[in-house]
Amino acid sequence: MISHIAQDITQCPHTKNPVFWNSNGIYSELTSEILKGIVDIVKIDFKYGNDKCAMRISKAPPNYVSIIRRNLKRAKSYSEVLIRVLVLPGHLDCCLRNILEYIRRDLGEYVRVNVMFQYRPEYKVMESEFTELKRRLSKGDVERVYKIVRESGLKNVIF
Protein backbone atom coordinates (compact mmCIF):
# COMPACT_ATOMS: atom_id res chain seq x y z
CA MET A 1 0.00 0.00 0.00
CA ILE A 2 2.75 2.48 0.87
CA SER A 3 4.26 2.02 -2.58
CA HIS A 4 0.95 3.04 -4.18
CA ILE A 5 0.76 6.15 -2.02
CA ALA A 6 4.36 7.02 -2.83
CA GLN A 7 3.68 6.55 -6.53
CA ASP A 8 0.69 8.91 -6.36
CA ILE A 9 2.75 11.54 -4.56
CA THR A 10 5.64 11.38 -7.01
CA GLN A 11 3.22 11.79 -9.92
CA CYS A 12 2.32 15.25 -8.58
CA PRO A 13 5.66 17.04 -8.96
CA HIS A 14 3.98 20.40 -9.51
CA THR A 15 2.73 20.63 -5.94
CA LYS A 16 4.54 23.00 -3.62
CA ASN A 17 2.84 21.65 -0.52
CA PRO A 18 4.99 19.75 1.95
CA VAL A 19 4.23 16.06 2.35
CA PHE A 20 3.46 15.17 5.97
CA TRP A 21 3.70 11.54 7.19
CA ASN A 22 1.72 10.90 10.39
CA SER A 23 2.50 7.54 11.97
CA ASN A 24 2.52 5.47 15.13
CA GLY A 25 6.12 4.73 14.16
CA ILE A 26 5.64 1.00 13.63
CA TYR A 27 6.61 0.48 10.02
CA SER A 28 9.16 -1.51 8.09
CA GLU A 29 12.60 -0.52 6.88
CA LEU A 30 11.23 -0.78 3.34
CA THR A 31 8.53 1.78 4.16
CA SER A 32 11.19 4.08 5.56
CA GLU A 33 13.21 3.72 2.37
CA ILE A 34 10.16 4.48 0.23
CA LEU A 35 9.40 7.61 2.27
CA LYS A 36 12.93 8.93 1.79
CA GLY A 37 12.91 11.60 -0.87
CA ILE A 38 9.12 11.94 -0.83
CA VAL A 39 8.21 13.06 2.67
CA ASP A 40 9.11 16.49 4.02
CA ILE A 41 7.87 16.10 7.60
CA VAL A 42 7.51 12.92 9.67
CA LYS A 43 5.40 12.90 12.84
CA ILE A 44 5.77 9.84 14.99
CA ASP A 45 3.83 9.03 18.15
CA PHE A 46 6.27 7.68 20.75
CA LYS A 47 4.06 6.51 23.59
CA TYR A 48 6.11 3.99 25.54
CA GLY A 49 9.68 4.24 26.81
CA ASN A 50 10.10 0.49 27.21
CA ASP A 51 8.89 -2.68 25.54
CA LYS A 52 7.24 -4.07 28.67
CA CYS A 53 4.72 -1.22 28.94
CA ALA A 54 4.15 -1.17 25.16
CA MET A 55 3.36 -4.89 25.02
CA ARG A 56 1.28 -4.94 28.20
CA ILE A 57 -0.92 -1.96 27.39
CA SER A 58 -1.06 -1.80 23.60
CA LYS A 59 -0.03 -5.31 22.58
CA ALA A 60 2.79 -3.67 20.62
CA PRO A 61 5.55 -5.80 19.10
CA PRO A 62 8.16 -7.03 21.61
CA ASN A 63 10.75 -4.77 19.98
CA TYR A 64 8.52 -1.66 19.96
CA VAL A 65 11.17 0.72 21.27
CA SER A 66 13.88 -0.37 18.83
CA ILE A 67 11.46 -0.06 15.87
CA ILE A 68 10.43 3.46 16.89
CA ARG A 69 14.05 4.48 17.46
CA ARG A 70 15.16 3.04 14.11
CA ASN A 71 12.40 4.87 12.26
CA LEU A 72 13.05 8.15 14.07
CA LYS A 73 16.76 8.03 13.23
CA ARG A 74 16.03 7.28 9.59
CA ALA A 75 13.32 9.94 9.35
CA LYS A 76 15.66 12.53 10.85
CA SER A 77 18.19 11.76 8.11
CA TYR A 78 15.78 12.74 5.30
CA SER A 79 13.07 14.98 6.74
CA GLU A 80 11.95 17.26 9.51
CA VAL A 81 10.79 15.25 12.52
CA LEU A 82 8.07 15.91 15.07
CA ILE A 83 7.75 13.46 17.96
CA ARG A 84 4.46 13.35 19.80
CA VAL A 85 4.44 11.94 23.33
CA LEU A 86 1.14 11.26 25.08
CA VAL A 87 1.72 11.37 28.83
CA LEU A 88 0.09 8.39 30.55
CA PRO A 89 -0.68 8.37 34.28
CA GLY A 90 1.64 6.05 36.16
CA HIS A 91 4.21 6.08 33.34
CA LEU A 92 6.21 9.25 33.94
CA ASP A 93 9.49 7.57 34.85
CA CYS A 94 9.28 4.29 32.96
CA CYS A 95 8.05 5.85 29.72
CA LEU A 96 8.14 9.65 29.49
CA ARG A 97 11.56 10.09 31.11
CA ASN A 98 13.08 7.26 29.02
CA ILE A 99 11.66 8.70 25.79
CA LEU A 100 12.93 12.22 26.46
CA GLU A 101 16.38 11.00 27.52
CA TYR A 102 16.64 8.95 24.33
CA ILE A 103 15.60 11.89 22.15
CA ARG A 104 18.14 14.22 23.74
CA ARG A 105 20.96 11.69 23.65
CA ASP A 106 20.45 10.19 20.19
CA LEU A 107 18.48 12.73 18.16
CA GLY A 108 19.58 16.02 19.67
CA GLU A 109 18.31 18.71 21.97
CA TYR A 110 16.54 20.67 19.22
CA VAL A 111 14.31 17.91 17.84
CA ARG A 112 10.68 19.02 17.94
CA VAL A 113 8.75 17.26 20.70
CA ASN A 114 5.07 17.71 21.49
CA VAL A 115 4.32 16.54 25.04
CA MET A 116 0.58 16.01 25.32
CA PHE A 117 -1.57 16.00 28.45
CA GLN A 118 -4.78 14.99 26.63
CA TYR A 119 -5.01 11.43 27.95
CA ARG A 120 -8.54 10.57 29.07
CA PRO A 121 -9.57 7.21 30.49
CA GLU A 122 -12.41 6.20 28.21
CA TYR A 123 -14.00 3.23 26.56
CA LYS A 124 -12.50 -0.15 27.43
CA VAL A 125 -9.72 1.12 29.66
CA MET A 126 -12.26 1.56 32.45
CA GLU A 127 -13.00 -2.16 32.28
CA SER A 128 -9.36 -3.19 31.89
CA GLU A 129 -6.74 -4.41 34.35
CA PHE A 130 -4.69 -1.22 33.82
CA THR A 131 -5.62 0.49 37.07
CA GLU A 132 -3.00 3.22 36.61
CA LEU A 133 -4.76 4.29 33.40
CA LYS A 134 -8.22 4.62 34.93
CA ARG A 135 -7.62 8.23 35.88
CA ARG A 136 -6.63 11.50 34.30
CA LEU A 137 -3.31 13.13 35.03
CA SER A 138 -3.31 14.88 38.38
CA LYS A 139 -1.98 18.38 39.01
CA GLY A 140 1.03 16.72 40.65
CA ASP A 141 1.58 14.57 37.55
CA VAL A 142 1.55 17.65 35.32
CA GLU A 143 4.04 19.44 37.57
CA ARG A 144 6.32 16.37 37.46
CA VAL A 145 6.06 16.28 33.66
CA TYR A 146 7.29 19.88 33.44
CA LYS A 147 10.16 18.98 35.77
CA ILE A 148 11.09 15.89 33.73
CA VAL A 149 11.04 17.95 30.53
CA ARG A 150 13.28 20.62 32.08
CA GLU A 151 15.69 17.94 33.34
CA SER A 152 15.81 16.31 29.89
CA GLY A 153 17.65 19.28 28.39
CA LEU A 154 15.41 19.32 25.31
CA LYS A 155 15.07 22.82 23.88
CA ASN A 156 12.22 22.49 21.37
CA VAL A 157 9.30 21.12 23.41
CA ILE A 158 5.72 22.28 23.07
CA PHE A 159 2.81 21.35 25.31
Locations of the language-model features?
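A structural motif corresponding to the C-terminal lobe/cap of the Radical SAM core domain
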Residues: 131-147
